[in-house]
Amino acid sequence: MSDIAPVTNTPYIPPTPEVGLPLWLLAELTYRCPLQCPYCSNPLDFAKQGQELSTEQWFKVMQEAREMGAAQIGFSGGEPLVRQDLAELIAEARRLGFYTNLITSGIGLTEEKIIAFKEAGLDHIQISFQASDEQVNNMLAGSKKAFAQKLEMARAVKRHGYPMVLNFVTHRHNIDRIDKIIELCLALEADFVELATCQFYGWAHLNRLGLLPTKDQLVRAEAVTNEYRARLEAENHPCKLIFVTPDYYEERPKACMNGWGNIFLTVTPDGTALPCHGARQMPIQFPNVRDHSMQHIWYDSFGFNRFRGYDWMPEPCRSCDEKEKDFGGCRCQAFMLTGDAANADPVCSKSYHHGIITQARDESETATQTIEELAFRNDRNSRLIAKSS
């Protein structure tokens, strides 16, 4: 299309071919958010983070990433809608040739903004829900108006020709109503539905005892989802259901981000560049886009090279015949659960720390924590956590 600028520079190809291109750029525009979901993946101390990047600084990030081969950009947060320059950022990403995603709670979205984003060239909008039940949704979101606003905006997104992509984070307090969740999605004429069981990073890790479903809950929920899949397929229905399980019930770890610094690059609101959105908590000095080019960050910085390849691996990963499949699992999870990011992901049954995972499974069977007892993601709690750390 004539309104898209071609990538004028040939992508830099590193001397070590095992380093992939940063194809997927996650632009965390802000940590500000009107909601306070207790499973948010943002850092616990988000309230103390530095000043947000300016419009021009984000333009530079996108330009440099595109020149390196980045193809897709996700605008996320916090809530990206609080940025007044969001339409400008979308338009620039479109001009550069990115496929553009907006990942939003829908709070703050209006029909006028949807039209403006469409004109700017936005390709895709994903709206998240907390539950199919208004009371539970609003309790988890920390807003009495959240559910009604989400419904209204989901319908508006559909009216304006976007594929309707809905995301439900499931956990022990809503997973038993997964049939109601799917029915709501069908009523909204969703094209894609991600039923993503809570992943335990950030605030979700803090609240794990009150969020991790039991194994029986997961088995039932997946069975219900499969029944709906079969029915939809028989009816030739276009809606696709994606069921994401927590790796706490697996015996082998996920190949997190397809390998550290291999395909995925996050830039946080203050410009810190990360190989995944959870890596900020590690005791590693990650580079900042204010100080370094994206090329230096991706290929030369210590933070992005720390866990590339296999030479860093201790046992049991070093001699494992599965290391090329899972890269030792998730470095952030290894750090959170064992205190050392170089350890094998405790999800793996070969890990010396696998007992941490089996203990969490056992605890889920007797957990009694209510929604009201969860630590909600808000400025007050974040400041308290930052002060005590």
Swiss-Prot record:
Alphabetical UniProt keywords: 4Fe-4S, Iron, Iron-sulfur, Metal-binding, Oxidoreductase, PQQ biosynthesis, S-adenosyl-L-methionine
CC cofactor: [4Fe-4S] cluster
Family annotation (Gene3D superfamilies): Aldolase class I
CDD domains: Radical_SAM (cd01335), SPASM_PqqE (cd21119)
GO BP terms in the entry: pyrroloquinoline quinone biosynthetic process
Molecular function terms, GO-annotated: 4 iron, 4 sulfur cluster binding; cyclase activity; iron ion binding; oxidoreductase activity; S-adenosyl-L-methionine binding
SMART domains to which the protein is assigned, alphabetical: Elp3 (SM00729)
Iron among keywords: yes
Name the record gives this protein: PqqA peptide cyclase
Organism from which the protein derives: Pseudomonas syringae pv. syringae (strain B728a)
Biological classification of the source: Bacteria, Pseudomonadati, Pseudomonadota, Gammaproteobacteria, Pseudomonadales
The gene coding this protein: pqqE
